[in-house]
Amino acid sequence: MQTLPIVDTSNTASSQHIFDTTIKRRKTRPVKVGNVTIGGGYPVVVQSMINEDTLDIDGSVAGIRRLHEIGCEIVRVTVPSMAHAKALAEIKQKLIKTYQDVPIVADVHHNGLKIALEVSKHIEKVRINPGLYVFEKPNVNRTEYTQSEFDEIGDKIRETLEPLVVSLRDQGKSMRIGVNHGSLAERMLFTYGDTPEGMVESAIEFIRICESLDFRNLVISMKASRVPVMLAAYRLIAKRMDELGMDYPLHLGVTEAGDGEYGRIKSTAGIATLLADGIGDTIRVSLTEAPEKEIPVCYSILQALGLRKTMVEYVACPSCGRTLFNLEEVLHKVREATKHLTGLDIAVMGCIVNGPGEMADADYGYVGKTPGYISLYRGREEIKKVPEDKGVEELINLIKADERWVEP
Protein backbone atom coordinates (compact mmCIF):
# COMPACT_ATOMS: atom_id res chain seq x y z
CA MET A 1 0.00 0.00 0.00
CA GLN A 2 1.52 3.30 -1.13
CA THR A 3 1.92 5.96 1.54
CA LEU A 4 2.43 9.55 0.48
CA PRO A 5 4.80 11.68 2.55
CA ILE A 6 3.19 13.79 5.25
CA VAL A 7 4.17 17.45 4.89
CA ASP A 8 6.21 18.63 7.88
CA THR A 9 5.75 22.35 8.48
CA SER A 10 7.85 22.52 11.62
CA ASN A 11 10.97 23.82 9.85
CA THR A 12 9.41 26.27 7.40
CA ALA A 13 10.34 29.94 7.47
CA SER A 14 6.95 30.89 8.87
CA SER A 15 6.78 28.01 11.34
CA GLN A 16 6.73 30.41 14.27
CA HIS A 17 3.25 31.47 13.10
CA ILE A 18 2.00 27.89 12.66
CA PHE A 19 0.78 25.62 15.43
CA ASP A 20 2.34 22.28 14.56
CA THR A 21 -0.38 19.63 14.54
CA THR A 22 1.91 16.75 13.53
CA ILE A 23 1.69 13.79 15.91
CA LYS A 24 5.01 13.31 17.70
CA ARG A 25 5.57 9.56 17.81
CA ARG A 26 7.36 7.81 20.64
CA LYS A 27 10.89 6.93 19.55
CA THR A 28 11.35 3.20 19.09
CA ARG A 29 13.95 0.88 17.63
CA PRO A 30 13.37 -0.53 14.14
CA VAL A 31 12.42 -4.21 14.10
CA LYS A 32 12.56 -6.04 10.77
CA VAL A 33 9.85 -8.53 9.88
CA GLY A 34 10.93 -9.80 6.50
CA ASN A 35 10.86 -6.82 4.13
CA VAL A 36 8.75 -4.70 6.51
CA THR A 37 10.10 -2.56 9.35
CA ILE A 38 8.11 -1.87 12.53
CA GLY A 39 9.11 1.18 14.57
CA GLY A 40 12.17 3.35 14.09
CA GLY A 41 10.10 6.18 12.63
CA TYR A 42 8.79 4.04 9.76
CA PRO A 43 5.09 4.34 8.82
CA VAL A 44 2.68 2.55 11.14
CA VAL A 45 2.35 -1.01 9.79
CA VAL A 46 -1.03 -2.65 9.10
CA GLN A 47 -1.54 -6.27 10.16
CA SER A 48 -4.30 -8.88 10.20
CA MET A 49 -4.76 -12.62 10.70
CA ILE A 50 -6.25 -15.24 8.40
CA ASN A 51 -9.11 -17.36 9.72
CA GLU A 52 -8.41 -20.47 7.65
CA ASP A 53 -7.20 -23.67 9.33
CA THR A 54 -3.43 -23.73 8.82
CA LEU A 55 -3.70 -27.39 7.80
CA ASP A 56 -5.63 -26.15 4.75
CA ILE A 57 -2.55 -25.15 2.80
CA ASP A 58 -4.27 -23.89 -0.35
CA GLY A 59 -6.91 -22.03 1.65
CA SER A 60 -4.28 -20.41 3.84
CA VAL A 61 -2.20 -19.31 0.85
CA ALA A 62 -5.31 -17.79 -0.72
CA GLY A 63 -6.25 -16.06 2.54
CA ILE A 64 -2.78 -14.54 2.97
CA ARG A 65 -2.77 -13.38 -0.63
CA ARG A 66 -6.22 -11.76 -0.35
CA LEU A 67 -5.08 -9.76 2.67
CA HIS A 68 -1.74 -8.75 1.18
CA GLU A 69 -3.28 -7.59 -2.09
CA ILE A 70 -5.48 -5.05 -0.28
CA GLY A 71 -2.71 -3.60 1.86
CA CYS A 72 -2.13 -5.95 4.80
CA GLU A 73 1.63 -5.75 5.29
CA ILE A 74 2.15 -8.55 7.84
CA VAL A 75 -0.11 -11.59 8.17
CA ARG A 76 -0.51 -13.72 11.29
CA VAL A 77 -1.28 -17.45 11.17
CA THR A 78 -2.26 -19.68 14.09
CA VAL A 79 0.01 -22.65 14.86
CA PRO A 80 -1.58 -24.78 17.62
CA SER A 81 0.30 -28.03 16.91
CA MET A 82 3.41 -29.48 15.30
CA ALA A 83 1.31 -30.57 12.32
CA HIS A 84 0.28 -26.95 11.83
CA ALA A 85 3.92 -25.86 12.11
CA LYS A 86 4.94 -28.22 9.31
CA ALA A 87 1.98 -27.06 7.23
CA LEU A 88 3.12 -23.47 7.66
CA ALA A 89 6.44 -24.36 6.04
CA GLU A 90 4.52 -25.58 2.97
CA ILE A 91 2.33 -22.47 3.02
CA LYS A 92 5.39 -20.24 2.96
CA GLN A 93 6.99 -22.15 0.09
CA LYS A 94 3.79 -22.16 -1.97
CA LEU A 95 3.23 -18.47 -1.32
CA ILE A 96 6.67 -17.62 -2.70
CA LYS A 97 6.22 -19.93 -5.68
CA THR A 98 2.71 -18.82 -6.71
CA TYR A 99 2.59 -15.19 -5.52
CA GLN A 100 5.41 -13.49 -3.61
CA ASP A 101 7.07 -13.54 -0.22
CA VAL A 102 4.80 -12.07 2.47
CA PRO A 103 5.96 -11.44 6.06
CA ILE A 104 4.26 -14.02 8.29
CA VAL A 105 3.87 -14.18 12.06
CA ALA A 106 3.28 -17.57 13.69
CA ASP A 107 0.89 -17.41 16.65
CA VAL A 108 2.06 -19.90 19.31
CA HIS A 109 0.35 -20.45 22.65
CA HIS A 110 0.16 -23.30 25.21
CA ASN A 111 3.53 -24.84 26.05
CA GLY A 112 4.71 -23.94 22.58
CA LEU A 113 8.50 -24.31 22.64
CA LYS A 114 8.79 -27.19 20.16
CA ILE A 115 6.21 -25.64 17.86
CA ALA A 116 7.88 -22.23 18.02
CA LEU A 117 11.31 -23.70 17.28
CA GLU A 118 9.92 -25.46 14.22
CA VAL A 119 8.09 -22.44 12.78
CA SER A 120 11.04 -20.13 13.46
CA LYS A 121 12.87 -21.92 10.64
CA HIS A 122 10.24 -20.93 8.08
CA ILE A 123 8.72 -17.54 8.92
CA GLU A 124 9.87 -14.07 9.96
CA LYS A 125 8.34 -13.62 13.39
CA VAL A 126 6.91 -15.62 16.28
CA ARG A 127 4.22 -14.31 18.60
CA ILE A 128 4.07 -15.77 22.10
CA ASN A 129 1.67 -15.08 24.95
CA PRO A 130 3.51 -14.84 28.31
CA GLY A 131 0.45 -16.13 30.13
CA LEU A 132 0.33 -19.33 28.10
CA TYR A 133 3.84 -20.01 26.79
CA VAL A 134 4.70 -21.91 29.99
CA PHE A 135 1.20 -22.91 31.00
CA GLU A 136 0.55 -23.59 34.67
CA LYS A 137 -2.88 -25.05 35.31
CA PRO A 138 -4.62 -22.86 37.93
CA ASN A 139 -4.91 -24.40 41.39
CA VAL A 140 -8.38 -23.67 42.78
CA ASN A 141 -7.17 -24.31 46.33
CA ARG A 142 -4.26 -21.88 46.18
CA THR A 143 -4.50 -18.79 48.38
CA GLU A 144 -1.10 -17.21 47.71
CA TYR A 145 2.20 -17.43 45.85
CA THR A 146 5.35 -17.33 47.93
CA GLN A 147 8.35 -15.51 46.46
CA SER A 148 10.18 -18.81 46.05
CA GLU A 149 7.23 -20.30 44.13
CA PHE A 150 7.04 -17.17 41.97
CA ASP A 151 10.78 -17.35 41.23
CA GLU A 152 10.67 -21.08 40.55
CA ILE A 153 8.20 -20.58 37.72
CA GLY A 154 10.29 -17.64 36.51
CA ASP A 155 13.28 -19.97 36.22
CA LYS A 156 11.16 -22.45 34.26
CA ILE A 157 10.05 -19.67 31.91
CA ARG A 158 13.65 -18.69 31.26
CA GLU A 159 14.65 -22.30 30.64
CA THR A 160 11.80 -22.75 28.16
CA LEU A 161 12.13 -19.37 26.45
CA GLU A 162 15.91 -19.39 25.97
CA PRO A 163 16.10 -21.91 23.09
CA LEU A 164 13.53 -19.93 21.09
CA VAL A 165 15.23 -16.62 21.78
CA VAL A 166 18.61 -18.00 20.71
CA SER A 167 17.09 -19.46 17.53
CA LEU A 168 15.41 -16.19 16.55
CA ARG A 169 18.48 -14.16 17.47
CA ASP A 170 20.83 -16.30 15.42
CA GLN A 171 18.49 -16.20 12.40
CA GLY A 172 17.94 -12.44 12.61
CA LYS A 173 14.22 -12.91 13.13
CA SER A 174 11.80 -11.23 15.53
CA MET A 175 9.32 -11.95 18.32
CA ARG A 176 6.15 -10.33 19.56
CA ILE A 177 5.60 -10.58 23.28
CA GLY A 178 1.82 -10.45 23.14
CA VAL A 179 0.15 -10.05 26.52
CA ASN A 180 -3.63 -10.54 26.72
CA HIS A 181 -5.63 -9.22 29.65
CA GLY A 182 -7.80 -12.34 29.62
CA SER A 183 -4.94 -14.84 29.89
CA LEU A 184 -2.55 -13.60 32.54
CA ALA A 185 -0.59 -16.33 34.32
CA GLU A 186 -1.91 -17.35 37.73
CA ARG A 187 1.21 -16.11 39.53
CA MET A 188 0.77 -12.66 37.97
CA LEU A 189 -2.89 -12.58 38.97
CA PHE A 190 -2.03 -13.44 42.58
CA THR A 191 0.77 -10.88 42.70
CA TYR A 192 -0.69 -7.93 40.76
CA GLY A 193 -4.35 -8.77 40.30
CA ASP A 194 -6.29 -8.67 37.06
CA THR A 195 -4.79 -5.27 36.24
CA PRO A 196 -2.80 -3.37 33.62
CA GLU A 197 0.12 -3.56 36.05
CA GLY A 198 0.01 -7.35 35.90
CA MET A 199 0.00 -7.19 32.11
CA VAL A 200 3.00 -4.87 32.07
CA GLU A 201 5.03 -6.91 34.56
CA SER A 202 4.30 -10.04 32.55
CA ALA A 203 5.80 -8.40 29.45
CA ILE A 204 8.77 -6.89 31.30
CA GLU A 205 9.70 -10.33 32.68
CA PHE A 206 9.93 -11.75 29.15
CA ILE A 207 11.73 -8.67 27.80
CA ARG A 208 14.42 -8.98 30.46
CA ILE A 209 15.04 -12.62 29.60
CA CYS A 210 15.41 -11.68 25.93
CA GLU A 211 17.77 -8.82 26.73
CA SER A 212 19.92 -11.04 28.93
CA LEU A 213 20.42 -13.22 25.84
CA ASP A 214 21.28 -10.18 23.67
CA PHE A 215 18.03 -10.41 21.71
CA ARG A 216 16.20 -7.15 21.04
CA ASN A 217 14.18 -7.76 17.88
CA LEU A 218 11.04 -7.41 19.96
CA VAL A 219 7.56 -5.98 19.46
CA ILE A 220 5.24 -5.69 22.48
CA SER A 221 1.45 -5.75 22.74
CA MET A 222 -0.99 -5.24 25.64
CA LYS A 223 -4.38 -6.27 24.28
CA ALA A 224 -7.67 -6.23 26.15
CA SER A 225 -11.31 -6.40 25.12
CA ARG A 226 -12.23 -3.34 27.22
CA VAL A 227 -10.88 -0.09 25.83
CA PRO A 228 -10.10 1.59 29.20
CA VAL A 229 -8.01 -1.43 30.27
CA MET A 230 -6.23 -1.51 26.93
CA LEU A 231 -5.44 2.22 27.08
CA ALA A 232 -4.13 1.99 30.64
CA ALA A 233 -1.95 -1.03 29.84
CA TYR A 234 -0.34 0.52 26.75
CA ARG A 235 0.30 3.84 28.48
CA LEU A 236 1.83 2.04 31.44
CA ILE A 237 4.10 -0.19 29.33
CA ALA A 238 5.28 2.86 27.35
CA LYS A 239 6.04 4.69 30.61
CA ARG A 240 7.80 1.70 32.18
CA MET A 241 9.90 1.02 29.10
CA ASP A 242 10.92 4.67 28.90
CA GLU A 243 11.96 4.56 32.56
CA LEU A 244 13.96 1.37 31.95
CA GLY A 245 15.64 2.66 28.79
CA MET A 246 13.72 0.22 26.58
CA ASP A 247 12.63 1.40 23.15
CA TYR A 248 10.64 -1.52 21.75
CA PRO A 249 7.86 -0.79 19.24
CA LEU A 250 4.26 -1.40 20.26
CA HIS A 251 1.60 -3.40 18.41
CA LEU A 252 -1.84 -1.89 19.11
CA GLY A 253 -5.20 -3.62 19.13
CA VAL A 254 -8.47 -4.09 20.98
CA THR A 255 -8.97 -7.84 21.13
CA GLU A 256 -12.47 -9.25 20.60
CA ALA A 257 -13.93 -5.92 19.45
CA GLY A 258 -16.94 -7.58 17.84
CA ASP A 259 -18.47 -6.71 14.48
CA GLY A 260 -20.31 -4.03 12.58
CA GLU A 261 -20.32 -0.36 13.38
CA TYR A 262 -19.70 -0.81 17.10
CA GLY A 263 -16.73 -3.12 16.55
CA ARG A 264 -15.15 -0.47 14.33
CA ILE A 265 -15.91 2.32 16.80
CA LYS A 266 -14.52 0.29 19.69
CA SER A 267 -11.29 -0.51 17.86
CA THR A 268 -10.89 3.09 16.75
CA ALA A 269 -11.50 4.40 20.27
CA GLY A 270 -8.58 2.34 21.55
CA ILE A 271 -6.14 2.43 18.65
CA ALA A 272 -6.61 6.04 17.55
CA THR A 273 -6.44 7.40 21.10
CA LEU A 274 -2.99 5.89 21.60
CA LEU A 275 -1.74 6.80 18.13
CA ALA A 276 -2.79 10.41 18.76
CA ASP A 277 -0.58 10.33 21.86
CA GLY A 278 2.34 9.09 19.75
CA ILE A 279 2.11 5.52 21.05
CA GLY A 280 2.05 2.65 18.56
CA ASP A 281 4.05 1.35 15.60
CA THR A 282 1.79 -1.33 14.11
CA ILE A 283 -1.95 -1.95 14.37
CA ARG A 284 -4.55 -4.63 13.92
CA VAL A 285 -8.30 -4.03 14.00
CA SER A 286 -9.86 -7.29 15.25
CA LEU A 287 -13.38 -7.79 13.86
CA THR A 288 -15.72 -10.76 13.99
CA GLU A 289 -15.94 -10.56 10.22
CA ALA A 290 -13.87 -11.60 7.22
CA PRO A 291 -10.27 -10.44 7.84
CA GLU A 292 -10.38 -8.39 4.64
CA LYS A 293 -12.90 -6.08 6.34
CA GLU A 294 -10.25 -5.05 8.88
CA ILE A 295 -7.79 -3.48 6.45
CA PRO A 296 -9.83 -0.45 5.29
CA VAL A 297 -10.54 0.43 8.94
CA CYS A 298 -6.81 0.41 9.72
CA TYR A 299 -5.96 2.71 6.83
CA SER A 300 -8.88 5.01 7.63
CA ILE A 301 -7.64 5.41 11.22
CA LEU A 302 -4.11 6.19 10.01
CA GLN A 303 -5.33 8.65 7.38
CA ALA A 304 -7.67 10.44 9.80
CA LEU A 305 -4.71 11.03 12.14
CA GLY A 306 -2.40 12.15 9.36
CA LEU A 307 -0.04 9.22 9.94
CA ARG A 308 -0.40 7.67 6.49
CA LYS A 309 -2.07 9.08 3.40
CA THR A 310 -3.20 6.30 1.10
CA MET A 311 -6.54 7.52 -0.27
CA VAL A 312 -8.57 10.61 -1.09
CA GLU A 313 -9.46 12.75 1.93
CA TYR A 314 -13.04 13.99 1.60
CA VAL A 315 -14.17 17.11 3.44
CA ALA A 316 -17.94 17.61 3.49
CA CYS A 317 -20.31 19.64 5.64
CA PRO A 318 -23.20 17.87 7.42
CA SER A 319 -25.87 19.76 5.39
CA CYS A 320 -28.42 22.25 6.68
CA GLY A 321 -31.19 24.57 5.45
CA ARG A 322 -28.67 26.67 3.49
CA THR A 323 -27.56 23.73 1.33
CA LEU A 324 -28.20 24.39 -2.36
CA PHE A 325 -28.05 20.79 -3.64
CA ASN A 326 -28.53 17.24 -2.38
CA LEU A 327 -25.25 17.05 -0.51
CA GLU A 328 -25.43 13.37 0.40
CA GLU A 329 -26.15 12.35 -3.18
CA VAL A 330 -23.44 14.59 -4.66
CA LEU A 331 -20.81 13.47 -2.14
CA HIS A 332 -21.59 9.87 -3.08
CA LYS A 333 -21.15 10.68 -6.79
CA VAL A 334 -17.87 12.52 -6.18
CA ARG A 335 -16.58 9.68 -4.03
CA GLU A 336 -17.51 7.00 -6.55
CA ALA A 337 -15.79 8.95 -9.33
CA THR A 338 -12.56 9.70 -7.44
CA LYS A 339 -12.09 7.06 -4.73
CA HIS A 340 -9.41 5.24 -6.74
CA LEU A 341 -7.11 8.27 -6.62
CA THR A 342 -4.35 8.62 -4.05
CA GLY A 343 -3.45 11.56 -1.89
CA LEU A 344 -5.95 14.26 -2.94
CA ASP A 345 -8.10 16.37 -0.62
CA ILE A 346 -11.53 17.06 -2.12
CA ALA A 347 -14.13 19.25 -0.40
CA VAL A 348 -17.86 19.11 -1.12
CA MET A 349 -19.64 22.02 0.55
CA GLY A 350 -23.33 22.82 0.34
CA CYS A 351 -23.25 26.61 0.52
CA ILE A 352 -21.05 29.71 0.40
CA VAL A 353 -21.06 30.08 4.20
CA ASN A 354 -19.06 26.90 4.85
CA GLY A 355 -17.52 26.69 1.40
CA PRO A 356 -14.32 28.63 0.75
CA GLY A 357 -13.22 29.04 4.37
CA GLU A 358 -13.59 25.51 5.68
CA MET A 359 -12.24 23.87 2.53
CA ALA A 360 -9.19 26.14 2.26
CA ASP A 361 -6.74 23.27 2.76
CA ALA A 362 -8.35 21.07 0.09
CA ASP A 363 -6.82 20.52 -3.34
CA TYR A 364 -10.22 20.83 -5.00
CA GLY A 365 -13.56 22.24 -3.91
CA TYR A 366 -17.15 21.69 -5.06
CA VAL A 367 -19.36 24.44 -3.61
CA GLY A 368 -23.02 25.40 -3.96
CA LYS A 369 -23.27 29.17 -4.55
CA THR A 370 -26.49 29.73 -6.46
CA PRO A 371 -29.43 27.38 -7.11
CA GLY A 372 -28.71 25.04 -10.02
CA TYR A 373 -24.99 25.89 -10.20
CA ILE A 374 -21.85 24.92 -8.37
CA SER A 375 -18.45 26.55 -8.20
CA LEU A 376 -15.28 24.53 -8.64
CA TYR A 377 -12.14 25.52 -6.77
CA ARG A 378 -8.48 24.70 -7.02
CA GLY A 379 -7.28 25.35 -3.49
CA ARG A 380 -8.58 28.81 -2.55
CA GLU A 381 -9.05 29.92 -6.15
CA GLU A 382 -12.46 29.74 -7.80
CA ILE A 383 -11.93 28.29 -11.28
CA LYS A 384 -15.38 28.13 -12.84
CA LYS A 385 -19.12 28.00 -12.22
CA VAL A 386 -20.92 25.11 -13.93
CA PRO A 387 -24.45 23.68 -14.04
CA GLU A 388 -25.09 21.30 -11.16
CA ASP A 389 -25.67 18.32 -13.47
CA LYS A 390 -22.18 18.85 -14.95
CA GLY A 391 -20.43 19.32 -11.61
CA VAL A 392 -18.81 15.91 -11.16
CA GLU A 393 -17.77 15.70 -14.81
CA GLU A 394 -16.16 19.15 -14.67
CA LEU A 395 -14.41 18.32 -11.38
CA ILE A 396 -12.82 15.33 -13.09
CA ASN A 397 -11.80 17.53 -16.04
CA LEU A 398 -10.15 19.98 -13.63
CA ILE A 399 -8.18 17.17 -11.97
CA LYS A 400 -7.18 15.90 -15.43
CA ALA A 401 -6.05 19.38 -16.47
CA ASP A 402 -3.71 19.39 -13.47
CA GLU A 403 -2.37 15.96 -14.52
CA ARG A 404 -3.42 14.45 -11.20
CA TRP A 405 -5.95 12.02 -12.66
CA VAL A 406 -5.34 8.32 -13.22
CA GLU A 407 -7.79 5.96 -14.83
CA PRO A 408 -9.48 3.52 -12.41
From Swiss-Prot:
Catalytic activity: (2E)-4-hydroxy-3-methylbut-2-enyl diphosphate + 2 oxidized [2Fe-2S]-[ferredoxin] + H2O = 2-C-methyl-D-erythritol 2,4-cyclic diphosphate + 2 reduced [2Fe-2S]-[ferredoxin] + H(+)
Domain of life, source organism: Bacteria
Swiss-Prot/TrEMBL keywords: 4Fe-4S, Iron, Iron-sulfur, Isoprene biosynthesis, Metal-binding, Oxidoreductase
Gene3D superfamilies (alphabetical): Dihydropteroate synthase-like, Sulfite Reductase Hemoprotein, domain 1
An example Gene Ontology biological process: terpenoid biosynthetic process
Binding-site residues, [4Fe-4S] cluster: 317, 320, 351, 358
Textual note on the cofactor: Binds 1 [4Fe-4S] cluster.
Pathway: Isoprenoid biosynthesis; isopentenyl diphosphate biosynthesis via DXP pathway; isopentenyl diphosphate from 1-deoxy-D-xylulose 5-phosphate: step 5/6
Cofactor: [4Fe-4S] cluster
InterPro entries the record matches: Dihydropteroate_synth-like_sf (IPR011005), IspG_bac (IPR016425), IspG_bac-typ (IPR004588), NO2/SO3_Rdtase_4Fe4S_sf (IPR045854)
Molecular-function annotations in GO: 4 iron, 4 sulfur cluster binding; 4-hydroxy-3-methylbut-2-en-1-yl diphosphate synthase activity (ferredoxin); iron ion binding
Functional description taken from the UniProt entry: Converts 2C-methyl-D-erythritol 2,4-cyclodiphosphate (ME-2,4cPP) into 1-hydroxy-2-methyl-2-(E)-butenyl 4-diphosphate.
HAMAP family: IspG
Stored NCBIfam families: ispG_gcpE, PRK00366.1
Family indicated by similarity: Belongs to the IspG family.
PANTHER family found in the cross-reference section: 4-HYDROXY-3-METHYLBUT-2-EN-1-YL DIPHOSPHATE SYNTHASE (PTHR30454), 4-HYDROXY-3-METHYLBUT-2-EN-1-YL DIPHOSPHATE SYNTHASE (FERREDOXIN), CHLOROPLASTIC (PTHR30454:SF0)
Protein name as annotated: 4-hydroxy-3-methylbut-2-en-1-yl diphosphate synthase (ferredoxin)
Species of origin: Nostoc punctiforme (strain ATCC 29133 / PCC 73102)
Originating gene: ispG
